[in-house]
């Protein structure tokens, strides 16, 4: 199999979320010791680096046509990735704890396309069984989970069925809009007297507009100085009368 090294290096170190990552002990050869490596699982590719800060992977394992199983080895929490074939290599790995080993075994077992085909096949069988239920009408969906067949892997959780949609709420009637806008007079709307526009009591008519008054006397056309003098004389006369009334006992 020919692979593009630059594309694999970019895919191994990109910012996309990973399926699993952590330190594992990898056995180098038939009689070699274990080396601590940083492993990253993306899809069906298992990359391993010198450490977590490395920018280029040391190698990659394509998880197709393989099985993941527990093995007895010098290291505790060991498991192996075995490929079919007489000359196929077996990768022996070891985790740092029991929980880490179980997590890696589960993630690696679900990484291949064979597992996805199995899941799709089981779901298709379920769908065919539901559709061809002897011509009987399907019951209404209830808010509970459907049982899965025993052959389906335990990794798939049952999907809860959705409840039936609620009944539609009747729409409220919209207010009736007038067919024409009321006329305007000098930019102001005039109250309409027709009952079609306002069914309630008739509003009071607007007050009449005041018009500019025309001059009626000689003072209306007099200049300001003359007006000031005339009104000043009246004020002085009134003030004199008021002072004289105070002086008299």
Curated annotation (Swiss-Prot):
Phosphoserine, modified sites: 213
Pfam families, A to Z: PH (PF00169)
Compartments where found: Early endosome; Recycling endosome; Golgi apparatus, trans-Golgi network; Cytoplasmic vesicle, Clathrin-coated vesicle
UniProt keyword Phosphoprotein present: yes
Renumbered residue ranges of the record's region Disordered: 134-159, 194-219
SMART domains, per database record: PH
Domain PH: 17-113
GO biological process: endosome organization; receptor recycling; retrograde transport, endosome to Golgi
Motif F&H per UniProt: ranges: 223-235
One cellular component term from this protein's GO annotations in UniProt: early endosome
Primary subcellular site in the record, as a coarse category: other
Known role: Plays a role in endocytic trafficking. Required for receptor recycling from endosomes, both to the trans-Golgi network and the plasma membrane.
Quaternary data: Forms homodimers and heterodimers with PHETA2. Interacts with OCRL and INPP5B. Interaction with OCRL may be important for endosomal morphology and function.
Family (UniProt): Belongs to the sesquipedalian family.
Domain commentary: The F&H motif, an approximately 12-13 amino-acid sequence centered around Phe and His residues, is essential for binding to OCRL and INPP5B.
Other observations noted: Was named after 'sesquipedalian', an unnecessarily long description of a simple thing.
Full protein name: Sesquipedalian-1
């Amino acid at each position: 199999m020919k692979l593009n090294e630059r594309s694999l290096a970019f895919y191994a170190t990109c910012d996309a979320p990973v399926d699993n990552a952590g330190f594992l002990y990898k056995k180098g050869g038939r009689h070699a010791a274990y080396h601590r490596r940083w492993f990253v699982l993306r899809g069906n590719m298992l990359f391993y680096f010198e450490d977590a800060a490395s920018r280029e992977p040391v190698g990659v394992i394509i998880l197709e046509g393989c099985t993941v199983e527990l093995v007895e080895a010098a290291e505790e929490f060991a498991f192996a990735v075995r490929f079919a074939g007489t000359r196929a290599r077996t990768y022996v790995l070891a985790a740092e704890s029991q929980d880490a080993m179980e997590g890696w075994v589960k993630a690696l077992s679900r990484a291949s396309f064979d597992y996805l085909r199995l899941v799709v096949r089981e779901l298709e069988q379920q769908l065919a069984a539901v559709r061809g239920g002897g011509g009987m009408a399907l019951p209404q969906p209830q808010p509970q989970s459907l049982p899965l067949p025993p052959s389906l892997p335990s990794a798939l959780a049952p999907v809860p069925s959705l409840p039936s949609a609620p009944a539609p709420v009747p729409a409220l009637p919209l207010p009736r809009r007038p067919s024409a806008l009321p006329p305007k007079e000098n930019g102001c709307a005039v109250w309409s007297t027709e009952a079609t526009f306002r069914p309630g009591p008739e509003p009071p008519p607007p007050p009449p507009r005041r018009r500019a008054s025309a001059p009626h006397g000689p003072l209306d056309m007099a200049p300001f100085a003359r007006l000031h003098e005339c009104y000043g004389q009246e004020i002085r006369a009134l003030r004199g009368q008021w002072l004289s009334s105070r002086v008299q006992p």
